[in-house]
């Protein structure tokens, strides 16, 4: 039995095919949130790759995106081999992406251990994250555990799913004690209301479900075979052509539209009995919509967060973002409260913070309008 994972057998799958519609008008189909540099000089995807490079060689990192975004992904990630940048023909939720990732890894190494990570998370404490991920790699390499990284809640958030953790797991015989604490996963729960979330946080027995998973190729395919046999069959077919980009693209174009659209949480994580939670004791954030930016931008005395030449009178708790690339002029505001104001070269968004989730509905209306769909 392995006591730790070999570097050459470590792989990372970064899921980067989302559209980030709640960050419209800056996030577009060809340049979505994960490809934007909202908080620094690098995009979220570039930062996600940089975080794992100390643990995994570039040749073992795969990016799963879509055809519209593939050119920009290639441009942003010159160190990642082109054949490792794979486009889904159509979005079929996270189970399909995980299945594709498993086929890609298995074609390289059937003894491989892979981490599946989102492209758009904010993780300032990189060293702590790397320690947890490394320990999770080692645990997944030792046996049949499905490891998920759970984040210790800092507030009763209602926008995340939660994981109920059970007893702390002892260090396996012959293995070194890790810095990371591992728990048995008792159950996954959907996004709660505020009162329930408060109970979860106060109990200390729940973690945020961050959508980060670590497992061996053998473990995840065994799980798919048991709980999602159709996905397992697809994985077997894709495995055979995974090292031939042209054949893989042709196969995916034919088969992907018929693949069941289901999340990996529902398809596998909620059903499996061998799930272990790695305690993610590091600062973490999932920027789901514009209001989340206020957690990372410096605010003025009235609580306004501005990335703009901004002047105001009697305005408070607003997010002002000027993304124009030319003809930038001051943005002047009077009497505005708790709002989002975003300006790009071709569009302006004004929304109340409490309605930020409805920006996705707005994008659908734009897409349905022949004159305005170019803005999506």
List each model region and its residues.
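Short coil/turn connectors at secondary-structure junctions
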Residues: 8-10, 58-59, 81-82, 109-112, ...
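Conserved N-terminal catalytic core of the sugar/cofactor nucleotidyltransferase
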Residues: 1-14, 22-32, 37-118, 122-130, ...
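A residue-level structural signature of the nucleotidyltransferase/glycosyltransferase Rossmann-like core
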Residues: 62, 114, 212-213, 285, ...
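Conserved core of the sugar-phosphate nucleotidyltransferase
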Residues: 126-254, 276
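Residue-level signal for inorganic ion chemistry
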Residues: 45, 101, 120, 163, ...
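A short acidic, often aromatic-flanked loop/helix-cap motif at beta-alpha or helix-coil junctions
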Residues: 91-96, 155-157, 194-195, 284-285
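Left-handed beta-helix
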Residues: 1-9, 217-376
């Amino acid at each position: 039995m392995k006591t730790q994972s070999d570097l050459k057998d470590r792989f990372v799958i970064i899921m980067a095919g989302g559209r980030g519609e709640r960050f419209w008008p800056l996030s577009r189909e060809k340049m979505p949130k994960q490809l934007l540099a909202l908080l620094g000089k690098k995009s979220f995807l570039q930062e996600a790759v940089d975080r794992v490079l100390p643990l995994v060689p570039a040749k073992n990192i795969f990016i799963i995106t879509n055809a519209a975004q593939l050119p920009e992904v290639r441009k942003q990630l010159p160190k990642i081999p082109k054949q490792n940048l794979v486009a889904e023909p159509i979005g079929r939720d996270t189970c399909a992406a995980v299945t594709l990732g498993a086929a890609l890894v298995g074609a390289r190494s059937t003894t491989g251990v892979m981490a599946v990570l989102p492209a758009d998370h904010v993780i300032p404490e990189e060293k702590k994250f790397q320690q947890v991920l490394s320990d999770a790699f080692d645990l997944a390499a030792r046996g049949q555990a499905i490891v998920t990284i759970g984040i210790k809640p800092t507030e009763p958030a209602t926008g995340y799913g939660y994981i109920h953790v059970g007893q702390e797991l002892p260090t396996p015989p012959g293995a070194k004690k890790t810095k990371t604490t591992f728990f048995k996963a008792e159950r996954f729960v959907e996004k709660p209301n505020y009162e329930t979330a408060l109970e979860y946080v106060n109990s200390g027995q729940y973690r945020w479900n961050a959508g980060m998973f670590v497992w061996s190729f053998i473990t995840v395919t065994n799980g798919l075979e048991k709980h999602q046999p159709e996905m397992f069959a697809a994985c077997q077919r894709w495995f055979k052509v995974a090292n031939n980009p042209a054949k893989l693209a042709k196969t995916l174009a034919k088969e992907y539209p018929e693949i069941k659209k289901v999340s990996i949480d529902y398809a596998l994580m909620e059903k499996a009995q061998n799930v272990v939670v790695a305690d993610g004791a590091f600062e973490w954030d999932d920027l789901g919509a514009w209001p989340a930016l206020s957690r990372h931008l410096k605010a003025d005395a009235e609580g306004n967060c501005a990335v703009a030449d901004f002047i105001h009178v009697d305005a408070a708790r607003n997010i002002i973002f000027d993304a124009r690339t030319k003809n930038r002029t001051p943005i002047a505001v009077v009497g505005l409260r708790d709002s989002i104001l975003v300006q790009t070269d071709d569009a302006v968004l004004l929304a109340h913070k409490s309605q930020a989730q409805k920006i996705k509905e707005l994008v659908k209306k734009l897409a349905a309008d022949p004159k305005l769909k170019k803005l999506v």
